[in-house]
């Protein structure tokens, strides 16, 4: 029996783990009474939200959870079950399409093009635009639904028929004008809850994470934290003290303010509702498919199989004294300022890091 292209990179033990999870999936879906992950159905059931079922997309998503739990079936089942329960209750797809409070408008941007105009989904988190932390982070429910909405809108643009980078996004945290000397209760609470959500429910969704315009003081903290994180996690983080150095890692397509030749960031941003746009595009493609002459077909296969997602679960940080230490991401940048911590750090790293940051600040 031949191995599908999207699974050929896997080791025999990993293939076996995936097969076991596939066999357990119907029970998990029945238990949670939910069938959608990142906008895609995990079974052929027609009811409920999500795009049409595809075995390839299902496998790519399952591999993210397996990778995050080192292919331990019991732990993966628990993580997947918890994520499905959370999605049913929290309704992240609604977060993606909802109109959020205008106070969040300037905090996040999504772009979908990279070098040479090639597809590259990137989250830009502009925490320097926060003028009133208590107003933004004090509204914990509103902030979290907005932040989850940004993530879901980004995931809707990814290609879940491709393992590795094709089904992952870049994330840039810009800390320009952010003060790390104060840590109010609202900001700390927002940071901890966002970290928990992204670590628990969005494993292996970040290819790399960049922290730019980071004060030298915080770089010292990042370097210290690196010693306690896995190589896979550290390999995802890149830290730059000067935002204009970002082009060294990503190329000239980034905006001029980040050292590239691209236009203003806000002009590069996609529309507010890419989820609907993606669904419309998929509908049109299906209509074209039905118009094809008999004998032609397209299969949901993968070309060159890439490496499945990295190992650490995805985490998130807010502009507090604990920014970098809470997220996973990519290879350290080729500059002296790029001693970054890991990609999607585990929740337990959040607190120690923030404490280290406070001590350093003092």
Curated annotation (Swiss-Prot):
Ranges for region Disordered: 275-362
One term under GO cellular component: endoplasmic reticulum membrane
GO biological process: Golgi to plasma membrane protein transport; regulation of exocytosis
Membrane topology: Peripheral membrane protein
Any GO molecular function: phosphatidylinositol transfer activity
Protein localization: Cytoplasm; Endoplasmic reticulum membrane; Microsome membrane
Main location: cytoplasm
Reaction(s) catalysed (UniProt annotation): a 1,2-diacyl-sn-glycero-3-phospho-(1D-myo-inositol)(in) = a 1,2-diacyl-sn-glycero-3-phospho-(1D-myo-inositol)(out)
Record's compositionally biased regions (Low complexity): 305-355
Domain CRAL-TRIO per the UniProt entry, residue ranges: 102-266
Skewed-composition ranges (Basic and acidic residues): 275-292
Binding site for heme: 127, 147, 173, 175, 209
A Pfam match: CRAL_TRIO
Cofactor: heme b
Family from the record: Belongs to the SFH5 family.
Function: Non-classical phosphatidylinositol (PtdIns) transfer protein (PITP), which exhibits PtdIns-binding/transfer activity in the absence of detectable PtdCho-binding/transfer activity. Regulates PtdIns(4,5)P2 homeostasis at the plasma membrane. Heme-binding protein that may play a role in organic oxidant-induced stress responses.
Record protein name field: Phosphatidylinositol transfer protein SFH5
Naturally occurring in which organism (per UniProt): Yarrowia lipolytica (strain CLIB 122 / E 150) (Yeast)
